[in-house]
């Protein structure tokens, strides 16, 4: 799910869709409007799920999409290799998430953890 917004209304720490990937905004710099053009905004973002840094330049009045990012709670059912099977505590839906070794060391079966859900993707989140 996504919603439309203007580049000028975005703030650091919010989310933005870049190349159909939900990204967190790290920094925004806005140039002054010139004699023959509108103000431009440079956004430095990092992908939530892939960790890739991206940079885009858009006019401040341009329309962009902001993904709806939800933080939900789930119970870890089992851990097999780098795949963690989890159950959402609200909808009782079972799903699998691929994790890295450092995340795998911080979770254990039977415990509750928080995860990020956006654009039909999931990732375990530690605050």
From Swiss-Prot:
One of its GO terms (biological process) is positive regulation of translational elongation. Signal peptide: none annotated. InterPro entries: IF5A-like, IF5A-like_N, NA-bd_OB-fold, Rib_uL2_dom2, Trans_elong_IF5A_hypusine_site, Transl_elong_IF5A_arc, Transl_elong_IF5A_C, Translation_prot_SH3-like_sf. The modification Hypusine is found at residue 35. Belongs to the eIF-5A family. One of its GO terms (molecular function) is translation initiation factor activity. SMART domains: eIF-5a. Gene3D superfamilies: 2.30.30.30, Nucleic acid-binding proteins. It comes from the Archaea. Functions by promoting the formation of the first peptide bond. It is found in: Cytoplasm. Keywords: Cytoplasm, Hypusine, Initiation factor, Protein biosynthesis. It comes from Methanospirillum hungatei JF-1 (strain ATCC 27890 / DSM 864 / NBRC 100397 / JF-1). GO terms for cellular component: cytoplasm. Its main location: cytoplasm. HAMAP family: eIF_5A. This is Translation initiation factor 5A.
């Amino acid at each position: 799910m996504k919603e439309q917004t203007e580049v000028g209304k975005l703030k650091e720490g919010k989310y933005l869709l870049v190349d159909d990937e939900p990204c967190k905004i790290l920094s925004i710099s806005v140039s002054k409007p010139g004699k023959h053009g509108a103000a431009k905004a440079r956004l430095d973002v990092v992908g939530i799920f892939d960790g890739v840094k991206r940079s885009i330049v858009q006019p401040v009045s341009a329309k962009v999409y902001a993904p709806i990012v939800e933080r939900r709670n789930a119970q870890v059912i089992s851990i097999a290799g780098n795949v963690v099977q989890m159950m959402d505590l609200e909808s009782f839906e079972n799903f699998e998430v691929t994790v890295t070794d450092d995340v795998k060391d911080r979770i254990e079966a039977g415990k509750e953890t928080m995860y990020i859900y956006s654009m039909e993707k999931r990732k375990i989140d530690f605050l």
